């Protein structure tokens, strides 16, 4: 079970145009993410994860948008060898919560493990890093060159 609370720490850029700061109150900045993560490792090479999710925004941008969004994500990892593998994730949005065109989030990645590091190169159509950003608000498709490149380095160590 995973739950997260996120707080927006940015200025409302539309305030100069309309005179109203939508982030004036602290609780307007909060969003909540809840997931039930079910995962299994099938042998040494393949792992699979299914995660139904729920996102709630205390305040949305447009009054016609819903505050609650839900869907389900699936992720996988396949290791070709002890050092090289491929990952993937797809998130399906179930309800129609906005008039804007948002798309399902999808990402693929390659990973290389060395003695103490894990290097990942990722391609995705999402912009946000946190679940409350990329699950409901992916506004690019793979078919219209809306692809983003990401890179992670992980270090494993023991105390």
Protein language model annotation of sequence segments:
Residues 1-3, 34, 50-52, 76, ...:
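Membrane-embedded beta-strand positions of outer-membrane beta-barrel proteins
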Residues 26-32, 66-72, 102-106, 113-115, ...:
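Residues that define the transmembrane beta-barrel architecture of outer-membrane proteins
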Residues 1-67, 134-144:
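Outer-membrane pore/translocation modules
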Residues 45-48, 82-88, 116-120, 157-159:
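Repeated loop/turn-to-beta-strand initiation elements of outer-membrane beta-barrel proteins
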Residues 81-83, 90-115:
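Surface-exposed substrate-engagement region within the catalytic domains
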Residues 108-117, 121, 126-128, 144-159:
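Outer-membrane beta-barrel "beta-signal"
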Residues 2-6, 53-55, 91-93, 124-126, ...:
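Outer-membrane beta-barrel pore domains and translocons
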Residues 49-91:
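A mid-sequence, solvent-exposed acidic-amphipathic segment
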């Amino acid at each position: 079970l995973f739950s997260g609370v996120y707080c927006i720490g940015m200025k409302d850029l539309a305030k100069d145009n309309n005179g109203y700061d939508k982030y004036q109150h602290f609780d307007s900045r909060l969003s909540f993410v809840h997931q039930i993560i079910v995962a299994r490792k099938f042998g040494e090479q393949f792992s699979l994860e299914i995660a139904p999710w729920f996102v709630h925004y205390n305040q949305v941008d447009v009054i016609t948008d819903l505050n609650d969004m839900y869907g389900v994500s699936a992720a996988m990892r396949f290791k070709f060898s002890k050092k090289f593998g491929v990952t993937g994730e797809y998130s399906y949005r179930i309800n129609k919560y906005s008039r804007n065109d948002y798309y399902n989030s999808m990402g693929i990645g390659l990973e290389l493990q060395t003695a103490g590091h894990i290097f990942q190169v990722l391609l995705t159509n999402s912009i946000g890093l946190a679940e409350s950003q990329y699950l409901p608000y992916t506004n690019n498709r793979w078919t219209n060159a809306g692809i983003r490149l990401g890179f992670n380095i992980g270090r494993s160590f023991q105390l």
